[in-house]
Amino acid sequence: MVCVPCFIVPVLLYLWHKFVQPILLKYWNPWEKKDADGNMIKTEPKNPFDCAGGVCRWAGKKTAVPPGHDPVGPTVAADTATSDAVDDAASSKKTL
């Protein structure tokens, strides 16, 4: 059986950090940044997914296809050659 403090303390810590602490920090926050006059410096949290100034930091880089490179993939002849080899291997196993 689990002792009562081993169950109650983690639950209370979770409730404190999830619900109570954010409410209290809105009214009393000793760690907030202040200017020389003692006024709170308001900074909005920066969202890393915002696209500011027409530039998105998380957009994928577009790469140009080199000349002479086939972006489609291997040719049909190469696909049939590999499938013939697979069929030959399968038929040889059946004959044994």
Curated annotation (Swiss-Prot):
Residue spans of biased composition, Low complexity class: 75-96
* InterPro entries registered for this protein in UniProt: UPF0729_C18orf32-like (IPR026776)
Tree of life domain: Eukaryota
Residue ranges annotated as transmembrane are: none
Instruction: For the region Disordered, give the residue spans.
Output: 65-96
Tell me one Pfam family matched here: DUF4512
Q: What family does this chain come from, according to its entry?
A: Belongs to the UPF0729 family.
PANTHER family linked: UPF0729 PROTEIN C18ORF32
Protein name, per record: UPF0729 protein AGAP000931
Q: Which organism is it from?
A: Anopheles gambiae (African malaria mosquito)
